[in-house]
């Protein structure tokens, strides 16, 4: 798993009070599945990895990543959820800066 994906996974697991291992499991509850989808979204949108690259990081197909991103985007219409995702994005951007990773649309691989 790439460094950006690990950062996103750790941030989401911490924010949702879930063990990182739960996000790596093959299946799980809806809450765990959504946490994994959010981590995939942050890896794709925040770090700019392609859907295929994100899929490889999370051992999922690129179409699964596309579906995850669509679900998160749809929920961002809810102000509280959008605020939480924005806070995660900001936190990841600060961490990425400190670790010399690129965070943003242009991303780094």
What does each of the following model-derived ranges do?
Residues 10, 14-35:
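Short, Lys/Arg-enriched anionic-surface-contact patches
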Residues 33-49:
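Short, amphipathic alpha-helical "recognition" segments used to contact nucleic acids or chromatin
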Residues 52-58:
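Short alpha-helical "recognition helix" segments of helix-turn-helix
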Residues 9, 50-51:
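Helix-turn-helix DNA-binding elements, focusing on the entry/boundary residues of the two helices
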Residues 76-95:
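Short Lys/Arg-enriched helix C-cap and helix-to-coil transition segments
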Residues 64-66:
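Helix-turn-helix DNA-binding helix
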Residues 44, 69, 76:
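DNA major-groove recognition helix of helix-turn-helix
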């Amino acid at each position: 798993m790439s460094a950006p994906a690990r950062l996103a996974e750790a941030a989401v697991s911490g924010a949702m009070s879930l063990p990182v291992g739960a996000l790596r499991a093959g299946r799980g509850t809806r809450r765990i599945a959504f946490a994994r989808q959010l981590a995939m979204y942050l890896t794709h949108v925040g770090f700019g990895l392609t859907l295929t690259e994100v899929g490889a990081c999370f051992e999922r197909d690129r179409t699964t990543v596309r579906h995850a991103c669509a679900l998160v985007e749809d929920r961002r219409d809810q102000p509280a959820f959008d605020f939480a995702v924005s806070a995660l994005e900001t936190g990841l951007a600060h961490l990425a800066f400190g670790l010399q990773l690129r965070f943003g649309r242009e991303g780094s691989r």
